């Protein structure tokens, strides 16, 4: 054995079976199996029984495909919170759920039927609905496996499904409350309509895309006016939906806007030369430029009120459109875009509809459910509205009514399922009034009583509720909970009889909602009513009413807690789950079903783009798990600010893998040095050295930071700081400094025991702090070293904090010492890079400072230990000092630092340079004593 290695066997080097090779993708499933074998969930329930409940209500994901990064992130965030609250001592009750009804599933089944050469109407309704149910069940099982794989801790056996009979019955119970208290009415209103899916859509089922449309400028000839100035003049309108011109029944103007009457003198379109047009004064320049009008004369300027009582003719008059088109005053008209006069098609826009109703304009729908003009629509019968634009333009041009056409790029609503554009269409629908029974008022009051995280989300949902229309709760589809209403054929009034409703609900609870849709609903009328007097409503409920009712059949009926402590969903749920739950609960219970609401952002790629197959930038949770493991995915979720949109990609994952390795290395160092066989002998706080107390003070502060993070469920800052603590303050500072004591001091020495005491506390707290995130990894370390008699780290109680550890003065002192150490290290690294030294132990460090406080700190601190050097001296700097390897002046701390090589001998065991080296064994006094003590112990043992 060489002199260099002759004493290696006398060192107390770290030993652990905790490998740096985590092999997470293959090891994590074994941990899940272990949890199942020990019935972990049941033990957690038993341990928490009788404690205060904490309920995070799970907003149901849709059961129509594999989970994606959004759904995985959502469930992981919920799980981190639940596991944290469990450690805090709460009885955490998490019941997962799924949204099972609705259009996306119907769409898939219809597609399957079409692939067989059939259509939906060829299939019995009961069979069709069973296919939908089977499809949902398939994806529920697949998603459940995926959620379990990312360690979501939940009561899977108690999971709720909106298609369960009990759930369907409760949804009907909730609807009946609105219906019987007069909040439900049948109205003829404009709704967002999908021609492809032939149904009304909710705002939450809409996505907006930029499209190019043909915007057109159209003339409406003035027929009647009290003012002769308008004789033979025309009103000019602008629209981006030419297909709605056949539905025009009026024109809207702003009473206080400024208008002018122009005479067109020269134009690229010779057919309009000489015509007189009315247009908003502020828009003359823009319109004439767009339409190629080169010369014009202003005949008159006037206020909009002069347009009152004017009657126009439809551009397609004499071709079936022989009706009056009145000018109507409206407060929504402005002069920022268009012509300052709006074409009104009452059936195809909300403002149009409301203005038509106010002025007794006939509301006539000329479009079928599938988006095709009805047979009695002159000129355009049988055409699809989206294919009619060019035909409408052609017909207008033929009648000299077209002034200009311009391509117009704008944001337009599309169905999120079919990806096709929707239309606004006035149809008979069922609505819940937001004014009846003060529903809007109750909702706004509840919003202000709820804690919103981030706080900006409160303004967002409040604005939505203040401005939203009545809730359209009917859908013209098959897969959902039916609207169980009978309509009197003569009076057209719905039958409001609680006994009838109760009978229906009772049967739905037993047999499901097929009893209405596929059975004989008239049997529920009993002997009290003649079935011949009634017709059955065939619509189903909006699926958002389903999910909005989950609080009733989950929080209440599963004996959880009402209201829930927390709802947590993506930012899109302000118009979805958050709002439907709010309105449903306020309408039936006068208050929100939640105390606090957390909103998280969308998951984007590393460049901040939305993930899509077309861009090839989709990152799936399954791919991350196969590549890096679920613990790494959870670490990403914990370190990311969820209040904003979150990014993920290859580079981000590479960084996360590095973060994970550093955390793992922290535990490897701890396990290697405290041993895995027994608990270390802990030293009393008063007997610890300052540097050890400093680490305890840091633990105390992290304990407080964690409490603050829990109060507003904002964990990313805590875990970022904790990661930095592990990688910088521990690995690169405390662990590095402690190696000499751990490896070279006597095994039972006070100094070494002080270090293992700190490592023990670090292990105990870090395991608790990281267990909600790195669920598998913490289980792995716990199996190797248990601080308490618990089968699983997740059964481990949170360690107790000692108030003695709080020491802000000590923290400030050591923050200053760390700055000094950093300055010293920069000199050491400079000397090392210049190949003047190999190890810092070859050096002695000198400091000259005028700062008395700093001088005092340095005199009372073992700087040799802190800087891992062989000598430290406080001296006055002189430029003539010899053998200086490197020099630095640190202005911030008022000091000069220089280093030189030590001239002392080397201890071949600890490698420190010491004045007293034993010539016989080349050891320093400390190492000689340690070896002698070991020899004496060995002799006694023999």
Identify the role of each PLM range.
Residues 202, 534-535, 912-918, 932:
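Short functional micro-motifs and their immediate structural scaffolds
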Residues 331-333, 359-371, 477-479, 498-645:
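Alpha-helical recognition segments enriched in aromatics with Gly/Pro capping
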Residues 194, 415, 488, 526-530, ...:
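Short cysteine-rich clusters marking metal-coordination/redox-active sites
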Residues 99, 191, 195, 201-209, ...:
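Acidic, turn-prone loop/beta-hairpin segments
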Residues 2-17, 21-24, 30, 34-38, ...:
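Residue patterns forming the tRNA-binding/recognition surfaces of aminoacyl-tRNA synthetases
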Residues 46-109, 171, 237-239, 243-244, ...:
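N-terminal catalytic cores of NTP/NDP-binding nucleotidyl/phosphoryl-transfer enzymes
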Residues 925-937:
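Short Cys/His-rich micro-motifs in 6-15 aa windows
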Residues 246, 250, 257-344, 350:
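Protease-associated
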